[in-house]
Amino acid sequence: MQGQTKSVSFDGREIKLTTGRFAPQAGGSVMIECGDTSVLVTATKSSGREGVDFLPLMCDYEERLYAAGRIPGSFMRREGRPPERATLISRLIDRPMRPLFPGWMRDDIQIVATCLSLDERVPADVLAVTGASMATLMAGIPFQGPMAAVRVGLLGDDFVLNPSYREIERGDLDLVVAGTPDGVVMVEAGANQLSEQDVIEAIDFGYEAITELINAQKEVLKESGIKQEMPKAPEIDDTISTYLDKNCTKSISEVLKNFDQTKEERDNKIEEIKISISAKIDGLKDDNAVKKSLSLNNKLLENSYKALTKKLMREQIIKEGKRVDGRELNEVRAIDADAAVLPNRVHGSALFQRGLTQVLSTATLGTPSDAQEMDDLNPNTDKTYIHHYNFPPYSVGETRPMRTPGRREVGHGALAERALIPVLPAKDTFPYVLRVVSEVLSSNGSTSMASVCGSTLALMDAGVPLKAPVGGAAMGLIKEGKEVRILTDIQGIEDFLGDMDFKVAGTEKGITALQMDMKITGLPIETIGEAINQALPARTHILGKMLDAIETPKDNLSPHAPRLLSFRIDPELIGTVIGPGGRTIKGITERTNTKIDIEDGGIVTIASHDGAAAEEAQRIIEGLTRKVHEGEIFPGSITRIIPIGAFVEILPGKEGMIHISQLSEARVEKVEDVVKVGDQVTVRVREIDNRGRINLTLRGVSQNGGMSNYPEPTPTPVAPLT
């Protein structure tokens, strides 16, 4: 079971593609490896199902914790529901693959990528995307590939190909680009306010590298004796489409050119035309070719009518430069933005509306212990900024069961989250964990970018000192032959009937996130650059409208938000603060009614709704961690008495003991003869033993009162002379 292995030298690393060895019953399989990262990707096709009028493509990325030498933390010690990271990588595979299958395909296709070994220097996601293309080609599935993906980072002024996790964290760019010989089909990126030109150059840099991986796949196919052939598309009966073209073109065009109507009015009129033509067909004789054609496929009318509407809308944009709502190609819809739309029990809130797209965003401030722990293969184990995106059915006037968030919700939330990360305050100056929730109240395109805008406003309303506000817009594209038109701020119908959805988010300074999906087999870098540059004035306009709602972050937090104190202690003294079995820190939290978090590096964060209580907890911890030296004198309070001495709290939470022999210059029979609990005394540190215990003394130390019965020294009796 050796199989065939093709090695590609790729930017100083070796990428291996092994076929014919693993998963022999899958339609096609490849083990793609780089360093110690290994991903098995399979592609399998089954025959289509009756009545399906779309491509039922399933892309799944599976993580196994054994890949990193770990055992799952669940009760059953087994991987459970896919983590968010796996969902995002599944989408990353799906997005460049889907447009490369022929439009007529209706067979079930499943691509499964399983990470079997993970090298922290080599992320698995881009390998999985490239492997998906190779496995599909090996399976002989009709596919307009090969396709490959790479990651591009930016360290200083230099682009880095397929950077490690550490390099991604240190760099100013994390960009994934996927492409075919025809051009770029997918882009996903997070950036630290980079200029448009820098991002365009990064995409170009990545696309050039893709060529090597595309050629390697072609060589594997050749060595395996597999010929890549695209079957002819099934013949489509054009009787219905010809009939609709003749009978509906004029009426649909009139609706699309009426710019004074609302979306609802336009949709209703287009639906009325369809109902009318359907009734007209029903009235035809049974032997009429149109009626006979429709009787063989009852979905033919619906599909042909959609295709005609799509064609007419696209022609109007290409030939007349006018969109269905009357906007120019580079025009943004009307914007309305408000901050503090909910009572201040919600720490921050905002309502952002662009056209018929409306999003309510809320911001909540939490303590470090509220960070989200990530039980996946990502080396970063927790998240301190979380964005959740909700898309209820009423937002598009529909009814359906309310279930857990799907892949789309997870993906949109992650994009909006990524857009804000570069402008969040540093952890050491603003140690809060932040959660933003974006509720889509109405959707007509670009809800993810509306969530970016709403998130910014909600965080500013919550008093989060953002480095800069972030806004975003979705760009679209219509391509007919050599004619290309780029659309700014696309609405729902333009997204559905167009060729591209390109979301660009950023500040006035530069881009923080972008995501491009295509419905065609590739786009040249020049066109992508044009779209990115056209998004800049739109973003500037949107940011201006946002700043009209709230110009700067609020100076004060909501009275219902926790107050945090953050300071650093010696990491070696963390155990002292925690105490045996956590007793010390538990005692502090109960005494002060606070919440305390301590990081491994010694950063202590105290949370409380009462500022004085937080300061008291800080005073206690600083007392516990303050080093005491022999000879120092402290005022203190007697806390407890034992037969051989008394304990004194000399610093908050730190006690020392006065041995009975150190209570007085004179002999003391009982400790209670000198001191009692609650007495205020002044003590000197006599010694600190090898176990760190503090031994105190009262001898030779001036007292300022407060002791119960401090005896004066008496002379030692002298034995009589004999």
UniProtKB/Swiss-Prot annotation:
Mg(2+) binds at residues 495, 501. One of its GO terms (molecular function) is RNA binding. Residues 712-722 have a biased composition (Pro residues). Pfam families: KH_1, PNPase, RNase_PH, RNase_PH_C, S1. Its EC number is 2.7.7.8. The keyword Secreted does not apply. Residues 562-621 form the KH domain. Residues 631-699 form the S1 motif domain. Keywords: Cytoplasm, Magnesium, Metal-binding, Nucleotidyltransferase, RNA-binding, Transferase. Transmembrane segments: none annotated. Its cofactor is Mg(2+). The keyword Chloroplast does not apply. This is Polyribonucleotide nucleotidyltransferase. It is an enzyme of class 2 (transferase). InterPro entries: ExoRNase_PH_dom1 (IPR001247), ExoRNase_PH_dom2 (IPR015847), ExoRNase_PH_dom2_sf (IPR036345), KH_dom (IPR004087), KH_dom_type_1 (IPR004088), KH_dom_type_1_sf (IPR036612), NA-bd_OB-fold (IPR012340), PNPase (IPR012162). One of its GO terms (cellular component) is cytosol. Involved in mRNA degradation. Catalyzes the phosphorolysis of single-stranded polyribonucleotides processively in the 3'- to 5'-direction. One of its GO terms (biological process) is mRNA catabolic process. It catalyses: RNA(n+1) + phosphate = RNA(n) + a ribonucleoside 5'-diphosphate. It is found in: Cytoplasm. It comes from the Bacteria. Residues 700-722 are annotated as: Disordered. Belongs to the polyribonucleotide nucleotidyltransferase family. Its main location: cytoplasm.
